[in-house]
Structures are given as structure tokens and as C-alpha cells.
Amino acid sequence: MSSNNDARKNQPLINDQIRFRTMVVIDDHGNNLGEMNRIDALNLAASKNLDLVVIAKKGNIPVTKILDYGKYKYEQKRRQKESRKNQTIIKVKEIKIKPMIGEHDLKVRAENAKRWLEDKDNVKFVIEARGRMCTKDEFIVQAYEKFIDLIKDYGTVVQANKKVSNYRYETIIEPIKK
């Protein structure tokens, strides 16, 4: 039931739903007609066979516009659909390794990263150094450099080997823009 109320709250007030005594009225051509009382504004909209719609509730006096409400709703839906179509969703895929990873295992993970970068997904490369490996920075750097060398033709490093905790290093790689 609350979702029904939420949908109603998002809808602007139209015609008889408007209970304000006075309001600023804008006609169907965009001209500001100034402040009017409710009855005169509703009569003016009815005489043009259009609707009176509250477009802004600023302060005590709302701003209303005379327009075709069905056309107005259609235009709003079309604009929302257009903006959703223009959005690009960026996915982030994650690869997690240990510093002492085998050569073949690293190549397999690099192939996965290449495939994801070709699909225009970002890749988060994580090195987890547990136990005494936390103190062996040379192994961490070596694993990082090997991986980056394997995928350098497919992506660019945005955030390089950042230490996010005592044992976790993260690198973010974006696909190369063509």
C-alpha cells in the first residue's frame, strides 16, 4: 500500500486536486499570467480545454501551468526513457591472487581480465598477502608488474597497487578507449 502512496506523491496536483487559494499561472504558450485565485485559474484552463497542473511548490504560492496533462505525462516518460537509454552501466570484475601465484595461474587470470576489458568492463586486481607474506613487498610488486605487463595492451591503470588494508592491495584497470 505504501508503494501506491509513493506513486501518488510523485504525481503533480491537477485541476480539482489543487487546494491552494492563489497561485502563479503560466499559460499554454509559456507566458506568465501572474497571480490568480484558484477558481479563475481553473476556469481559464477549462475554457482552453486544458488542465491546470502544479509544476512547482515554492513557498506559500505554487506555480501552475495550463497544459494538456496527457501530453505532459507522455513527454516526461519519453525523457526518462531517453535518459535511461543514454546511461552506460560500468561493471567492475574482480581478480584475486596471492603474491606467490604460479606463472600459468597468473596467465589464466590475465586472459579473463583481457576478455572483460574487451567487453568494456573495469577490472579490480586484488593481491592478498596473508601471514608472513605481508612483509615480503618484493613478491607483491613482482606479481603486480607481471600481471600489468600481461594486460597492458587491453587496459590502463587508474589506481595503481593501493594498499587498502594490512594484507590487501588493489589496482583498478579501465579498458582502453578506442
Swiss-Prot record:
Query: Which key words tag this protein in UniProt?
Result: Cytoplasm, Initiation factor, Protein biosynthesis
Residues of the signal sequence? none
The family database entries (InterPro entries) matched by this protein are listed as: T_IF-3_C_sf, T_IF-3_N_sf, Translation_initiation_fac3_CS, Translation_initiation_fac_3, Translation_initiation_fac_3_C, Translation_initiation_fac_3_N
**Broad class of where this protein is predominantly found:** cytoplasm
Give the Pfam families listed for this entry.
IF3_C (PF00707), IF3_N (PF05198)
Q: State the protein's purpose.
A: IF-3 binds to the 30S ribosomal subunit and shifts the equilibrium between 70S ribosomes and their 50S and 30S subunits in favor of the free subunits, thus enhancing the availability of 30S subunits on which protein synthesis initiation begins.
Q: How does it assemble?
A: Monomer.
Protein name, as recorded: Translation initiation factor IF-3
